[in-house]
């Protein structure tokens, strides 16, 4: 199998894809052993030219890999040519012994379509090298900015969709979940299914930070925000960045209001929109006295070297009484798997289209958190969805009026006067959260039954789950989703994988057809700028 692994991504900032890249690199190093070869990551330097904290990895900084939109065909062609030339140079480096495997992460998402095109160009020219496109997410899931970029680039590169999904004898796709595996199969793309590796070594270098010391650091950080954490309450940890699709307002509702617990959450995403939402959510929590700490890794400054060389998340897993996940969509869903490795139960929501891998028992999670429709401005919500769906999927439907859409929307997503909290936009979610907090959460027992299975935590020692299930899931995560099991799957799907068929008919339109319905789309999946005014005369099916 491959002696040189070259991973290509937009950046190496903290996040889910970077975690996957680091664990791919570690697995490759363990499989390769000694001898010639190389372990390479190609990405933009971003703000900091830091040394990658991964074993035996050489970083190749290529600024053109960064996120970018293009205003002209000339700029697109110029960046594409530069990227193609640099990727060829990395492949041709005499120190990079063959066979070579080049892995592109999320290049179908559209965050830099010149990088996507250059990756396909080099794959077409270098038949002696294996290329693997690892797909974590799809633009078609409702990522408006990515869809806009794709439509813009199509004006001067009409074949960009074929470059996103080429069919070549040395080009293969790998996806992270069964839903994407089914969709790629329906599109006619030769695709492997490879779960993401879950951490198997749970004790950080230097051991665990003491509970008292960690609690003090968290409490001081929270007080600087105007938030008072309550040591008498359980601690719930949501190990994600604050992004729209992570549905963090629901985590506040479930943990702080319905569960009577403290909540710890990671920092905001990289967009101004994510940071603004975190600030609005924090303002509400301060005003209503909700014990939620956002951007929790700031507490690291008060712990110094005690954290060791890694992130705080392992210490927070160990510290928390229970973990939560409320995301509306997930590529893999580390927050639904990794807590079990630390002996902690996971509560919250099952993402749309999600199914657990590795034999994990996901009992205790809900699929819908009902909210009375009279609590929100339903007409405003319907118009926002109408604009959003038309912006994401223009031309998908024949003519109909907004009234037709409203009828389909109400028939599909409103049941007995209730709507799922995750169907709301962020404004609607904050309004509901504020209403419940102001009322002292006495108005809606149905939400408690959905969120916690009929009960709230009794105290800090309450695991919200039976110990038998926690132990079983911990064993299954460590046996099936990490270590040797992952290395075997990684070797089969990535390092040795080649297409079983290519050059056949491919129809990636199935992605649009699947995601353009009211059942699949969520306003929380929007990213970047506001939704443009919708177009009239579109028929939007239920």
Which positions does each model-derived feature cover?
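N-terminal subdomain of nucleotide-sugar transferases
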Residues: 1-51, 97, 123-129, 484-491, ...
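Conserved donor-binding/catalytic core segment of Leloir-type glycosyltransferases
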Residues: 6, 216-246, 252-255, 264-265, ...
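N-terminal strand-loop element at the rim of the active site
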Residues: 13-14, 31-83, 109, 271-272
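Short beta-strand->alpha-helix junction loop in the catalytic core
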Residues: 46-47, 179-180, 194-209, 511
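Short N-terminal targeting/anchoring amphipathic segment
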Residues: 87-115, 129-134
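Membrane-proximal helix-turn-helix segments that form the acceptor-binding/catalytic region
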Residues: 121, 139, 149-172
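Nucleotide-activated donor-binding/catalytic signature segment of Leloir-type glycosyltransferases, i.e.
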Residues: 233, 275-316, 322, 361-375
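Aromatic "clamp/platform" in nucleotide-sugar-dependent glycosyltransferases that forms part
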Residues: 328
